[in-house]
């Protein structure tokens, strides 16, 4: 059985077995949309970037609906948020490729529409936070196809949310490969080391070399045990970084980790929670 389909983007004959793709897409594309504020949290590995991103997502969800994107292949954001890990973007990509090769999806069906539908199915939905995980790269040294899907997801999905918060992989690979179009706020997280500040400065320089537009770049120094040493303060000034928050070492994080609890259960007096509140206030998010 074949069905004639005619939309603004596609006109043609498909098999009846493929009709559910279009029914799903019509509902998806028919929603009224509004632009989201896009925030990227970046930093070298081991500085507590995901912890900052998780608390930022949780606190912003009290103000609006948040799309949380885990762009780190290690996919730890779901644990920090206390959410299950659903199908990843990379897995969805593999399923679509296999379905096309086996003829389950007709080559005449717009691939972008099918991608959009699969990305939506990969969303882990909760009350005020939806999570999309990037997952593993396509193969050794290649992240291109999955990155393209992530960009597609951001472009289409973000319009349905008040905030889009991206937990970037170390080095901001998705930005350097133009996965993210424009960013309203880039929060670079560093620890209290010269190496961390230098990495933050390199990220800031990388942004200036790319076509990606970034509205504001801000530095957050995490896990401070006793303020900032003069050497760190001098390095921040030397590299022209804008420091907006210094977050003390948080003893509650280790306690939650030992009990297998998510970071969003940090108490109100948690240094990390208070520090992220300061970030939101200073950036007027």
Roles of regions detected by a PLM:
Residues 37-73:
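Walker A/P-loop phosphate-binding motif and the immediately C-terminal alpha-helix
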Residues 260-268:
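C-terminal boundary of histidine-terminating zinc-finger modules
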Residues 62, 145-249, 255:
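Conserved catalytic-core segment of NTP-binding enzymes
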Residues 111-121, 125-126, 130-168:
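Cytosolic-facing regulatory segments adjacent to core modules
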Residues 1, 11, 22-25:
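Short hydrophobic targeting helices and cationic amphipathic motifs
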